[in-house]
């Protein structure tokens, strides 16, 4: 056993939690001593949980009032606040997401610490239960051998040595020593009830801890999923995802406060036990085990007297006396009564087995083994266990703050998306620079489709037979352009009018270029006149 663990000293956070006021539901001060069967003490733990529940109610009331005010407030100058609101929503979502991730990280550590502490507690309880069960098994086995097996051998030897009074007297003395051994073994504590209680406590604690650990693990995963889906909803500007995550955020907020209430009351009750665990154990076992025995195992000091020393000493002396008697009978009686050798050797083997059991009982009854299990159980639950519960409480508090900010930010994001859609829908559909009109024009073009030029290259004769109609000059583009120019206070420039529909080439062409241009446009003029009507 490590020297640092010889004496148990409760950590400072245990005293910090233990010094909290213990008030019952009638607001009266109660003793902080751990007594889970006392209704008054149960009310003190319930009062702590109700304080946390009151904080949760205030938090939910604040969120509700904020959401109602946000929905009912009149729209002010949105154009001035839209950019600020969008930036605020972004930063709030980012901070709440980081806070939630930090809370989940702290929660993972706290959950692991609590699980380690409870595992160490159950492991120590199992070891102590194994020790006590071993003592009971050895004591019952030795008692059975002394009562049943030894009596059978002595009965047959009495018949063999009936003619020798001195040998019969030795057998009676051995019977008396066996009675002393049985009496001393009976005086030892009966650990059967205690071992059963330890086994039940270890099994129930292990089962509860497994479901607690699994529940927190699922809670961590759900919190991370809510944060990720909320970020996806904000990135994709999805109102449906934001609405769903708003509902899940409220549920997560209530779960955070609920877990905080459970963790606070559990940590406070465990701290009350860890401040004075020996006092509680002595009160619980006073009707099963003597106070001297419990005190011997709880403190295990060299200055304390071993309460089993006298019984074990009598046991050892009685065995030694019986072995001396058997050795004498083997030496002097067997030559006279050869048939007695088998029973005497059987008694000798029984005494050797009983001596081996005595050494094992002495080792198991020593306080160092059970005291080590006791210290390890205390360190597991009072150090790792309570520390883990404090970290879980911090996780719940940070998660509650994160989801409060997230729930308050999502309606702002909703309003921002609604304002964006409303501004988008208010754009004039006839505006040629409207992005929506551009998309509609791209997907549903209204202009005529250009015919393939390959269809006109099938036969030159058919092209030659086509006579181009006389080009009709349309003044519609010119008039439209002039109207637009006059509207904006400018002078119309005919040079900027498109060349579609004009029969003459540009005035800047040279005569050679003009002749080339006319020769190239004579035949396909009918084609272009159909494709691009004037």
Swiss-Prot record:
Q: Does the keyword Transmembrane helix apply?
A: yes
Q: Name one GO biological process term.
A: L-glutamate transmembrane transport
Q: Which cysteines does the record link by disulfide bonds?
A: 274-382, 300-367
Where found in the cell?
Answer: Cell membrane
InterPro entries from the entry?
Tweety
Which residues does Ca(2+) bind? 113, 116
Please indicate which superkingdom the organism of origin belongs to.
Answer: Eukaryota
Q: Where is this site: Essential for the formation of the channel-pore?
A: 164
Quaternary structure, from the entry: Forms cis-homodimers in the presence of Ca(+2) and forms monomers and trans-dimers in the absence of Ca(2+).
Return the PANTHER family for the record.
PROTEIN TWEETY HOMOLOG 2, TWEETY-RELATED
Chain's role: May act as a calcium-independent, swelling-dependent volume-regulated anion channel (VRAC-swell) which plays a pivotal role in the process of regulatory volume decrease (RVD) in the brain through the efflux of anions like chloride and organic osmolytes like glutamate. Probable large-conductance Ca(2+)-activated chloride channel.
Protein name as annotated? Protein tweety homolog 2
Please name the source species. Xenopus tropicalis
């Amino acid at each position: 056993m490590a020297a640092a663990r010889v004496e148990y000293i409760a950590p400072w956070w245990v005293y910090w939690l233990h010094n909290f006021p213990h008030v019952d539901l009638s607001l009266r001060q109660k003793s902080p001593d751990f007594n889970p069967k006392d209704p008054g003490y149960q009310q003190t733990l319930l009062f702590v949980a109700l304080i946390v529940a009151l904080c949760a109610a205030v938090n939910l009331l604040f969120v509700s009032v904020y959401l109602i005010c946000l929905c009912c407030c009149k729209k002010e100058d949105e154009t001035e606040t839209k950019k600020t609101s969008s930036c605020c929503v972004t930063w709030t979502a980012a901070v709440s997401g980081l806070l939630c991730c930090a809370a989940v990280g702290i929660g993972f550590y706290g959950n692991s610490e609590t699980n380690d502490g409870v595992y160490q507690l159950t492991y120590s309880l199992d070891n102590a239960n194994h020790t006590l069960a071993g003592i009971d098994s050895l004591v019952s086995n030795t008692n059975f051998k002394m009562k049943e097996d030894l009596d059978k051998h002595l009965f047959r030897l009495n018949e063999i040595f009936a003619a020798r009074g001195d040998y019969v007297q030795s057998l009676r003395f051995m019977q008396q020593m066996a009675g002393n051994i049985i009496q001393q073994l009976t005086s030892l504590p009966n650990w059967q009830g205690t071992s059963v209680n330890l086994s039940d406590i270890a099994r129930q604690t292990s089962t509860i801890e497994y479901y607690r650990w699994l529940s927190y693990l699922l809670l961590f995963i759900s919190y991370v999923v809510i944060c990720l889906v909320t970020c996806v909803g904000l990135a994709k500007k999805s109102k449906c995802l934001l609405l769903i995550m708003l509902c899940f955020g409220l549920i997560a907020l209530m779960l955070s406060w609920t877990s905080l209430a459970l963790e606070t009351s559990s940590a406070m009750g465990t701290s009350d036990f860890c401040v004075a665990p020996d006092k509680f154990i002595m009160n619980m076992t006073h009707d099963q085990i003597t106070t001297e025995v419990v005190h011997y195992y709880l403190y295990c000091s060299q200055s304390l007297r071993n309460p089993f020393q006298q019984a074990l000493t009598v046991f050892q002396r009685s065995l030694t006396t019986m072995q001396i008697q058997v050795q004498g009978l083997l030496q002097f009686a067997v030559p006279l009564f050869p048939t007695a050798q088998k029973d005497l050797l059987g008694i000798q083997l029984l005494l050797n087995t009983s001596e081996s059991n005595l050494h094992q009982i002495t080792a198991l009854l020593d306080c160092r083994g059970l005291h080590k299990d006791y210290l390890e159980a205390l360190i597991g639950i009072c150090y790792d266990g309570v520390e883990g519960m404090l970290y879980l409480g911090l996780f719940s508090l940070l998660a509650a703050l994160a989801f409060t900010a997230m729930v308050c930010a999502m309606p702002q994001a909703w309003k921002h998306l609604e304002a964006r859609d409303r501004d988008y829908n208010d754009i004039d559909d006839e505006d040629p620079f409207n992005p929506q009109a551009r998309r509609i024009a791209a997907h549903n073009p209204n202009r005529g489709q250009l015919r393939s030029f390959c269809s006109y290259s099938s036969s030159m004769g058919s092209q030659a037979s086509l006579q181009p109609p006389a080009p009709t000059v349309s003044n519609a583009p010119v008039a439209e352009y002039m109207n637009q120019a006059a509207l904006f206070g400018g002078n119309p420039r005919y040079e900027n009018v498109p060349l579609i529909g004009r029969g003459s080439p540009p005035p800047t062409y040279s005569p050679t270029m003009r002749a080339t241009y006319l020769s190239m446009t004579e035949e396909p003029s009918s084609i272009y006149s159909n494709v691009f009507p004037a």
